[in-house]
Amino acid sequence: MELFGVSATLIATFVGFGLLIGILFGFFGMGGSFLVTPALLVMGYESTTAVASGLAFVFGTSVIATLKHRDLGQVDYKLGALMIAGTTAGIEVGKIGLEALEHMGWADTVVSVAYVFLLGGIGLFVTREALKGDGGGGLEHDVDEDADVGDADIPEIAQKIQSYRVPPMMKLRGGFRVSLWMILLVAFATGLLSGFLGVGGGFIRMPALFYLIGVPVPVAVGTDLFEIVFSGGIGSFLYAQSGAVDLSIVVPLLSGSALGARLGAAATSLVDEGDIKVYFGVMLLLGAIAVAVRKLGGVFEIPVMDTVSLVIILGAALLVSGAVTYSAIRELRDEADGRAVAAEV
């Protein structure tokens, strides 16, 4: 049985895949192109179609997830607008650096090594900090813009950056103030890395918002997704003009992610912030291993390594999304038990 020239089995696969990635996307503010594009390439789609369809999927999913985070009060629009401005400038400079390396013939090697080390480094750092229990992640889940974040809830690096009182000062969600120039500097740095590595950068921005600026983890996720709406929208529009976006891929993926993104976003208001950081770190560490395996397969001309890499990525996605879902259900059950005990008393 086929629909629009695509087998029902493949459509069902895309819907399930979209649900899985949607949960991760709504929960972490990353994972779309990181997972979709490699999967489509291994399935035999042309690189342009894979990239374009991946971007269109990221755009649609980020809109859905951002709306849910907005309902939970987890999007700082002012910070998001500033991050977009700084990130855009950084991406342009990063692209210049990448083009220079391409002219020298070093681009593939340098970018691959940098990508693996960055994924692994951020993953190790976030996991270590979460297990140490330093910095609880700011406000508890549903964030009141006028509520204050205590110093104990803000990472030391962010406290140091906040101490530079260079005007103008911007008041962010959580009641703390940060210099406009510090925000733009962090945004520029994350954009520089994104442009240099040729990736969306969600895995860079989310920890940067928390560890460098001091934004509560759920708000960091929601604000990161708000930024992705714009970057994904522009990329999708440009590729759609050339007809590279394959709707037979995008529509079933979005059908699954429409539910997954809302579930993932809702889970950020239930799951402990320490657990969020641990899951995020584990996802990046496994992603680093998968990318390293794929690159080694290319160097030694072992095609099967691409499949092994994809299995690692999909396995990581299944494992982490399952852990997220389990943690959210556990929190709901504990809350229900608590209410039942209170009612009996």
Where are these regions (language model features)?
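Small-residue-rich hydrophobic segments that form or flank transmembrane alpha-helices
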Residues: M1-H103, T109-S112, L118-G120, L124-L131, ...
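Flexible cytoplasmic inter-helical loops of multi-pass small-molecule transporters
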Residues: L131-I161
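A contiguous, mid-protein "functional segment" used to position or interact
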Residues: A266-I312
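Serine/threonine-rich low-complexity intrinsically disordered regions
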Residues: S7, G150, P155, R173, ...
